[in-house]
Swiss-Prot record:
Gene name of the record: rplA
InterPro entries named in the record: Ribosom_uL1_bac-type, Ribosomal_uL1, Ribosomal_uL1-like, Ribosomal_uL1/biogenesis, Ribosomal_uL1_3-a/b-sand, Ribosomal_uL1_CS
The protein's name in its UniProt record: Large ribosomal subunit protein uL1
Gene Ontology BP, a term: regulation of translation
Keyword set includes Transmembrane: no
Length: 235
């Protein structure tokens, strides 16, 4: 059994971590348990009723959170010609093609998200093994492989979150900073859940949203009473 510090124990005093809460209470308790000296990120973990080993049950997408993420997102754009100027004007931090691929191969991955135009994807594929494990590989399904680089950059800067289920069928996503307060976090969560629901595979049978937990960077996970989720989304 891992030992936790005094601040952690104090934050959980009187709380049963096996209890399930309404969405609003789970967020509130998570924020109340944020004790770190830095502004912790609020995260959600959602277990879906899908089997990702089947390609038609892979849930993957993107959502622009209405209240952003509360952090500066460094965006790299792989493109050529006039698209480079378009990307820079939209606020891209790093722009290039062969030169940018060479930088990544050298170990310089000082960006948080990447966009690529379709005509350079063969080039970007050379560094897929470096980008993929970090969640940085551009993907058409999330809108990061596109000729409309200005739109993609603007969305990423505004707080777009790319997500996909892992091998266990669990989807992880950030919802913003603890300093946002409950209203903004709940607004971001609603936008995420609406998007995830729209992406439900037709081949997925039974319950789709199985379980959910809200946590902060250093805090515990507070489980959500899934019978309350529909009410939250309709509210």
């Amino acid at each position: 059994m891992p030992k936790h510090g005094k601040k952690f124990r104090n934050a959980l005093e009187g709380t049963d971590l096996q209890e399930r809460f309404s969405v609003e209470d789970a967020v509130g308790k998570s924020l109340g348990a944020a004790f770190a000296k830095f502004d912790e990120t609020v995260d959600v973990a959602i277990r879906l009723g899908v089997d990702p080993k089947y390609s038609d049950q892979m849930v993957r997408g993107a959502v622009t959170l209405p209240n952003g993420l509360g952090k500066t997102v460094r965006v790299a754009v792989f493109c050529k010609g006039e698209k480079q100027a378009e990307a820079r004007e939209a606020g891209a931090d790093i722009v290039g093609a062969e030169d940018l691929v060479a930088e990544v191969k050298a170990g310089n991955l000082n960006f948080d998200a990447a966009v690529a135009t379709p005509d350079v994807m063969a080039l970007v594929g050379q560094i897929g093994r470096l980008l993929g494990p970090r969640g940085l590989m551009p993907n058409a399904k999330t809108g990061s492989v596109t000729f409309d680089v200005a739109k993609a950059v603007s969305e990423l800067k505004a707080g777009r979150v790319d997500f996909k289920v892992d091998k266990a069928g669990v989807l992880h996503a950030p919802l913003g900073k603890a300093s946002f307060g409950p209203e903004k976090i709940l607004g971001n969560l609603k936008a995420l859940l609406d998007t995830v629901n729209r992406l439900k595979p037709s081949s997925a049978k039974g319950t789709y949203l199985i379980s959910m937990a809200i946590s902060t960077t250093m805090g515990p996970g507070f489980k959500v009473d899934m019978t309350q989720v529909k009410k939250f989304l309709e509210g």
